[in-house]
């Protein structure tokens, strides 16, 4: 791969995003956590909202989890919001060495190790923050980078170690060519996101197609990497939505661990449990909701009943599944 060609391409096409105009480690970490499972346009909205309210780790640490989750609502993958709150409190723990701040500049290994010691920070996020905030040569590996490596080498099933080695080698070549680590990592990721896409690959616009073995292979670039078999488990649940005379539902806060931890919603139980049979007794089936998670399919029967006192869900952090369940129940009540 020609580092200069990729860096030149990136300089011409790089998207103007606010987290690319700062070296604040907290702002960059927040963007990386959001963008792991959220598209850029939506991530920008949530990044601005969260950074306005929590401009420092200390500001988030001082808030309770419910406020953080309420601001996170709609961004999806709610465990990220919980872990971010845990991270902020860990950074601000008076017995910890952080002093309320993310790591000071140091060696690449030291900064990456320090970041990975924090809740919810894995190798990708640590490398991204180290390279973008501190310009340290820590090569990132995400789905986009993995795809570029696989196609450049025409390797259908590269191991994690092989992908990291390739990314590290590219980083060394880029730094030797005078390219900043922050620029290089973002260039490779953007190449995978906008040109070397999973489908609809744009080889004609690729600045490094000359070195791409996937393009010249008989199978073509989209054959790489080989798709992984995906196993989706189906769970059947019963959601109980009891409404008061004003149409407000009875809501409970979910436990601090497990699916949708800390969020609010109607009681929801396994459809095959003894509790499900008892909860369905005397209530009416309002409808069904199918909800897809990354490796799980949730099929939910929504039943409705009556309660003396409900709560307005707008003021509480809820999951997108709970929002859909409540909509089915309220539509049934209004019919």
Language-model features: locations:
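Catalytic cores of DNA base-excision repair glycosylases
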Residues: 5-204, 208-220
């Amino acid at each position: 791969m020609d580092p200069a060609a990729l860096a030149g391409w990136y300089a011409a096409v790089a998207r103007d995003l606010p987290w690319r105009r700062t070296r604040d480690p907290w702002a960059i970490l927040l963007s990386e956590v959001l963008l792991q499972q959220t598209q850029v346009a939506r991530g920008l909205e949530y990044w601005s909202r969260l950074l306005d309210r929590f401009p420092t780790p200390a500001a988030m640490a001082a808030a309770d989890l419910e406020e953080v989750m309420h601001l996170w609502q709609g961004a999806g993958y709610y465990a990220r919001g919980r872990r971010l709150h845990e991270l902020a409190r860990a950074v601000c723990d008076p017995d910890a060495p952080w002093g309320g701040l993310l790591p000071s500049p140091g060696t690449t290994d030291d900064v990456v190790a320090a970041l990975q010691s924090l809740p919810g920070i894995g190798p990708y996020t640590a490398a991204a923050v180290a390279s973008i905030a501190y310009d340290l040569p820590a090569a990132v590996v995400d789905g986009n980078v993995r795809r570029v490596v696989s196609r450049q080498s025409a390797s259908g099933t590269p191991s994690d170690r092989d992908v990291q080695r390739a990314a590290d080698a590219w980083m060394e070549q880029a730094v030797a060519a005078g390219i900043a680590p922050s620029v290089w990592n973002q260039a490779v990721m953007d190449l995978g996101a906008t040109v070397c896409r999973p489908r609809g690959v744009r080889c004609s616009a690729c600045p490094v197609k000359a070195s791409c073995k996937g393009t010249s292979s008989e199978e073509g670039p989209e054959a790489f990497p080989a798709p992984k078999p995906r196993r989706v488990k189906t769970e059947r649940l019963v959601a109980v939505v009891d409404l008061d005379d004003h149409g407000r539902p009875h809501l409970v806060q979910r436990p601090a661990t497990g699916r949708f931890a800390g969020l609010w919603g109607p009681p929801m139980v396994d459809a095959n449990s003894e509790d499900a049979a008892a909860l369905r007794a005397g209530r009416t089936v309002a409808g069904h909701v199918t909800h897809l998670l990354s490796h799980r399919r949730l099929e939910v029967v929504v039943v409705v009943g009556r309660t003396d006192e409900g709560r307005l869900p707008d003021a509480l952090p809820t999951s997108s599944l709970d929002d859909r369940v409540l909509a089915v129940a309220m539509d049934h009540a209004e019919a």
